[in-house]
């Protein structure tokens, strides 16, 4: 039995089914996913790191889905977004695709103190106070403390006659077990990596094709900052702007932008 080394240094037995599931999430067919898993199983060695396994998956998937050679892993891509304003704007766009009217970055008075609110989302009779919690490390956990703070903020806001239906925490990390239990007990909405089942952050991104621009290989931090400063967070937005407009906004050469534009089109 081969053991793989996780990002935190711990080891766990290799599970072939995880390779298949990863390939399927990347829209590979079932036959292709199983064939890739078979190939990888023959190449693995004791202690191989999960990051190296992901690179191998992308390499093999590129034979079946050429567009994947232009992108990095989705989880890593979301981690590369700046917490403010990029990740917050990203969550705002996601909520809009779910039919919410969204207001970003409000300061509201509670009974005791003022609170900086990442987003307010309204739909039908529902008004959500949304907390966006970003992590740079892809294998971090969002702990119960974030949910304790969200609940305290909600109570202080509503004590001053605000009318929020509930608090919602959206994070690009997994949730700790204590966080899940507390969120369920206090009726706090929670969305994170692989949580909740069927409505997790990565599924929402994939189902709506809300791919962050950081997914595209070859974008340096300067260009990403210029795109973010102009509100361009998604691959779809980048394509919609086109090379000419992007050139005026970013001052990056048209030849470089055309290369990026072509990669973006293939991803979509």
Where are these regions (language model features)?
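Intrinsically disordered, low-complexity Ser/Thr/Pro/Gly-rich regulatory segments
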Residues: 30, 61-211, 228-229
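Long, C-terminal-biased catalytic regions of enzyme "large/alpha" subunits
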Residues: 1-82, 87
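Proline- and acidic/polar-enriched loop/turn elements at helix boundaries
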Residues: 35, 107, 195, 239-240
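N-terminal alpha-helical segment
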Residues: 15, 33-36, 71, 163, ...
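C-terminal extensions
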Residues: 89-91, 204-268
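Short coil/turn linker and secondary-structure boundary residues
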Residues: 14, 28-31, 48, 142, ...
């Amino acid at each position: 039995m081969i053991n793989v080394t996780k990002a935190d240094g711990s080891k766990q037995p290799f599970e072939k089914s995880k390779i298949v599931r990863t390939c399927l999430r990347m829209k590979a067919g079932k036959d292709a996913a199983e064939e890739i898993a078979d190939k990888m199983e023959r190449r693995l060695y004791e202690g191989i790191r999960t990051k190296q396994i992901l690179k191998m998956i992308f390499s093999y998937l590129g034979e079946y889905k050429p567009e994947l050679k232009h992108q990095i892993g989705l989880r890593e891509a979301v981690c590369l977004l700046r917490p403010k304003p990029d990740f917050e704007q990203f969550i705002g766009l996601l909520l809009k695709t779910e039919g919410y009217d969204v207001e970003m970055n409000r300061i509201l008075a509670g009974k005791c103190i003022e609170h900086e609110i990442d987003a307010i989302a309204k739909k039908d009779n529902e008004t959500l106070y949304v907390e966006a919690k970003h992590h740079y490390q892809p294998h971090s956990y969002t702990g119960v403390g974030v949910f304790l703070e969200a609940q305290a903020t909600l109570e202080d806001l509503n004590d001053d006659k605000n009318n929020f239906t509930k608090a919602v925490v959206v994070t690009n990390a997994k949730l700790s077990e204590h966080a899940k239990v507390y969120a369920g007990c206090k009726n706090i909405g929670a969305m994170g990596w692989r949580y909740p089942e069927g409505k997790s952050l990565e599924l929402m991104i994939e189902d709506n094709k809300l791919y962050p621009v950081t997914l595209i290989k070859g974008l340096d931090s300067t260009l990403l900052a210029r795109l973010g400063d102009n509100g361009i967070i998604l691959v779809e937005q980048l394509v919609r702007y086109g090379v000419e407009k992007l050139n005026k906004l970013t001052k990056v050469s048209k030849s470089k932008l055309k290369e990026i534009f072509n990669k973006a089109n293939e991803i979509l």
